[in-house]
């Protein structure tokens, strides 16, 4: 891709991130689940925005799982168990500017299957 196309894609991602982030807010009873995906790994964390603390997190790198749909499902299963240990059953999903497709969608769907209400 040309440099101009890459800059445009990055700008659109930042605009999506700011637009969605302005509308959602995590509380202690309903934290925000923020996802991040790199070229190799997938990460997620539950955040209480009132206090600015992370309540639960999962790291695909520590689990040795790469960034694909099957691994995102395993990461979501691990994350759901850590949320249940923290007695969290309802969350707000922050896709962090990523399109709701592929790995992000597989992660969210698996969280729903594990009884976490998004």
Curated annotation (Swiss-Prot):
GO BP, sorted A to Z: translation
Transmembrane portions of the chain: none
One term of GO molecular function: 5S rRNA binding
Domain of life assignment: Bacteria
SUPFAM superfamilies: Translational machinery components (SSF53137)
Gene3D superfamilies the UniProt entry points to: 3.30.420.100
Family, similarity comment: Belongs to the universal ribosomal protein uL18 family.
Quaternary structure annotation from Swiss-Prot or TrEMBL: Part of the 50S ribosomal subunit; part of the 5S rRNA/L5/L18/L25 subcomplex. Contacts the 5S and 23S rRNAs.
The name this protein goes by in its record: Large ribosomal subunit protein uL18
Protein encoded by which gene: rplR
């Amino acid at each position: 891709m040309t440099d101009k196309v890459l800059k445009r894609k990055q700008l659109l991602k930042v605009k999506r991130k700011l637009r969605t982030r302005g509308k959602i807010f995590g509380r202690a009873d309903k934290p925000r689940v923020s996802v991040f995906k790199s070229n190799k790994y997938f990460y997620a964390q539950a955040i209480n925005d009132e206090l600015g603390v992370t309540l639960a997190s999962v790291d695909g790198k520590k689990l040795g799982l790469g960034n694909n749909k099957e691994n995102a499902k395993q990461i979501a299963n691990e994350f759901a168990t850590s949320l249940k240990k923290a007695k969290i059953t309802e969350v707000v999903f922050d896709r962090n500017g990523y399109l709701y497709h592929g790995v992000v969608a597989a992660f969210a769907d698996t969280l729903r299957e594990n009884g976490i209400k998004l």
